[in-house]
Amino acid sequence: MMKINMILSCMLLWLVSACTSQEVVEITVSPEVTNAGYIGNGAEWDPYDEAEAWGASISDKDWETLCKRLDFMKPQYIRCMINSPYRYYDSETGTYDKTRNIASISRLLRYCTERGITVMYGEYNPPTWDMKQDQKWVDMSVDYLNYLVNDLGFSCIKYFVIFNEPDGNWASTNGDYEMWKQMLFRFHRKMKEYPGLTEKVMLAGPDVVADYKNEASAYDAEGWVKQTALDADSIIGLYDVHAYPGQNEVRTGQYPEILSRYKRHVPEGKKIVLGEAGYKYWRDADSLLMAEYNRRVEGHPFTKGSDCNMLCYDYFYGLDMPLLAMEVMNGGYSGMAVWMLDDAMHSSGDSGKTEDVKKWGMWNILGEEVFNKPDEEQIRPWFYTWSLMCRYFPAGTDILHTAVASEDKDVYVVAGTYQGKLSVAMVNVGEKDKSVQLTLPCPMENASLYKYEENLQPKDADGFPVPQETGFHLKGTYKTTLKAQTFQLLTDIQ
């Protein structure tokens, strides 16, 4: 009998332990607005400058596929950059033709205009590096901008970038802040010559890379933002930086401090966005990810890996991208464009060759036509969560204050209201399931819950997310189990 009692006692202890093994995480969403008028989340979507050089333009069928995917995703903010030798500048003759190769960029900008998407447009570099201070480039570039905005009516273009990452040693500016600043004012003066252009389009900058310092430059990235605010705020409509953190520094909660370094220099009344955002694994803490990256690059048929994220195929990338967005949104930034939408946009150095393609996207729409890899055209896992972060935090969302009571830093959350509706996104990057008790600032009517788990990603026939639960009503609290390494989004936006 004693033996039986001992067995029963052990079983009872095991059951109690099992029932209480999940840590309770209390999340409180208050009605306090911490970041008003969010511009939105989106992606880098460049107009397939190299496609024809690779041997295939984007077909009508592929455009239909792209539009269908984007119509579900509802990006609120697109960064669209061109290489002028593939557009208005003929390198062989040195001549300007604004109608040259206009079809694909027109199609892209028409899509954004018709759907009210904010576009940050610009040029990666001048037509040739020797032209970086040439008035001819300024004249051509601004005339082309005016052609797109005023002549063709692409009113989606709200911001204009004159150099991509001018602080970089890979840029034609090579970190020369003074030269960049002078060119910024020259571009602005030229824009003012076109009636109404500066009322429709404002300059964005400095477009520098966070956590980077070019030895040839007088300033690190923070210094660039600070000096831009001091020297050129009168002509800057939107501040932007690029961010490529490591997984470990974001998952361990270090990134808000890094983001704040740039935000604190932005003058009151102005906004700042991430013009590009992705992950790179060169830091020591991410060495295992880097080893896997290198393994995948070795012998790859169409990339050497010089500018890629070979892990964008993986489930975990669908946790890391919304996690970064949560830090951005809670950190007072106004938007984030992921790098990038589609592998079919760039090769390293924009060489026009397919031997070293930049693989960062949610798919490669030219997988079959150019690379003889039809599977590359399929949607990758991270589209699941990123599309939800775009769709359910529309332009104009007010980001709310959230508090997470937890023993560790495994659970992250962001919440926002839009026209009286609420969206709450949560991610658990830890190794244990969490019992979440969510306190809401208002009731939710006809709410939906989306779940992204490694073995549970409900989708429709097109591969788009569908909610795990629908039609429920919440008075002010909600309880759920947020499993280890998973994402959930709760919304009553229809």
Predicted regions and their residues:
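Bacterial Sec-dependent N-terminal signal peptides
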Residues: M1-E23
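Aromatic/acidic polysaccharide-binding cleft in carbohydrate-active enzymes
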Residues: Y279-F393, T397-Y412
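C-terminal accessory region downstream of the catalytic core in glycan-modifying enzymes
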Residues: L438-F472
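C-terminal beta-strand-rich structural cap/linker in extracellular carbohydrate-active enzymes
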Residues: P465-Q494
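Noncatalytic carbohydrate-binding groove/subsite architecture in carbohydrate-active enzymes
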Residues: Y177-E327, G331
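Carbohydrate-binding surface patches
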Residues: S406-E445, Y452-E454, Q485-L489
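Mature N-terminal, pre-catalytic/accessory segment of carbohydrate-active enzymes
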Residues: C19-E64
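Substrate-binding cleft and catalytic face of glycoside hydrolase catalytic domains
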Residues: L70-N248
